[in-house]
């Protein structure tokens, strides 16, 4: 993750802390399907993705200028799900109304670990009103991951947050980068987090670019920890470990998505951290994924 993204999440934390939501709003949320499906459908020509989403960090510059217009553009492309990373100085009620007008749902959102640690009730109120099923932490400070002890303390915190989320009929998840695959004290941090967290309380959003960059095979983790990856970030890698639009790189998407049921994948979010043209990027990725058969 770049320093820009860390700053973006820090700003999001400040925005979340400034919001105060009445508890009564929690019952008004529109929720995505909770059936635990794979997000894919079968056909005579093979399986294909049914619900394709996008991580809104990809379009942050456009959303800051024209929030509703950008969401409307995503709906016109064909997206039906979005994943938030910041609320752009809007109230959850305002955002929910816009989503409903555009026919979009927000099954997940990224929230800073600090917000969930320091104000779990307020943060989970926001997630509930937005209609999330999953509340995701997308970054760990170095102090939370630089030793075996700190990793286990982080896992304990994840379990506590997961319990608080479960009490609200939400699920807590953690999103990886590549640092989780560099050994710390002889251990792989991602493995420690998976082993030390309760499978009934903590899930994972596998970023398929970053795990590839980290030198690991997603299928290995699907086999070792089945059902723990309900969310994936879909972004491609080209020569030189460059991030590119989905379909423009070398990642074998059919191979990965063929194991979606073992992984437990429910939601697929397209992302590109630094696209030259955000709308062109998410359009190209969407078209590739709509045509993919596996």
Where are these regions (language model features)?
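N-terminal secretory signal peptides and thylakoid transit peptides that target proteins
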Residues: 1-23, 27
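C-terminal segment of N-terminal export signals and the immediately downstream linker at the start
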Residues: 25-62, 73
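Acidic (Asp/Glu)-rich catalytic clusters
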Residues: 42-48, 72-76, 90-106, 119-132, ...
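Hydrophobic faces of well-ordered beta-strands that scaffold small-molecule active sites
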Residues: 50-55, 82-84, 106-109, 135-137, ...
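Conserved, mostly hydrophobic/aromatic
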Residues: 54, 74, 82, 99, ...
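Active-site mouth loops of central-metabolism enzymes
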Residues: 55-65, 110-116, 148
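Gly/Pro-rich active-site loop or hairpin
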Residues: 71, 181-183, 187, 210-265, ...
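Active-site acidic/histidine proton-transfer and metal-coordination neighborhood
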Residues: 81, 88, 113-204, 211, ...
């Amino acid at each position: 993750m770049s320093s820009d993204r860390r700053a973006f999440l820090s700003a999001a934390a400040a925005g979340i802390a400034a919001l105060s939501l009445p508890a009564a709003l929690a019952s008004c949320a529109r929720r995505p399907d909770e059936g635990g499906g794979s997000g894919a459908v079968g056909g005579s020509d093979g399986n294909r993705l049914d619900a394709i989403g996008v991580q809104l960090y990809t379009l942050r510059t456009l959303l800051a200028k024209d929030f509703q217009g950008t969401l409307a553009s995503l709906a016109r492309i064909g997206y039906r799900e979005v994943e938030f990373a910041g609320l752009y100085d809007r109230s959850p009620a305002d955002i929910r109304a816009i989503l409903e007008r555009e026919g979009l749902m927000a099954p997940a959102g990224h929230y800073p670990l600090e917000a969930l640690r320091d104000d779990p009730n307020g943060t989970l109120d926001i997630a509930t009103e937005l209609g999330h099923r999953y509340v995701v932490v997308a970054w760990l400070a170095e102090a939370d991951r630089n030793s075996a002890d700190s990793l286990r303390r982080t896992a304990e915190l994840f379990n506590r947050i997961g319990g608080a989320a479960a009490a609200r009929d939400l699920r807590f998840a953690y999103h990886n980068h590549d640092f989780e695959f560099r050994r710390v004290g002889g251990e792989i941090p991602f493995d420690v987090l998976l082993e030390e967290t309760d499978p009934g309380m903590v899930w994972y959003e596998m970023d398929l670019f970053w795990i590839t960059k980290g030198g690991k095979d997603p299928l290995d983790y699907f086999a070792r920890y089945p059902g723990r990856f309900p969310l994936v970030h879909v972004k491609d890698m080209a020569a030189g470990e460059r991030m590119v639009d989905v379909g423009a790189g070398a990642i074998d998407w059919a191979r990965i998505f063929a194991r979606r049921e073992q992984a437990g994948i429910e939601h697929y979010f397209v992302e590109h951290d630094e696209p030259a043209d955000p709308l062109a990027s998410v359009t190209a990725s969407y078209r590739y994924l709509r045509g993919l058969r596996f």
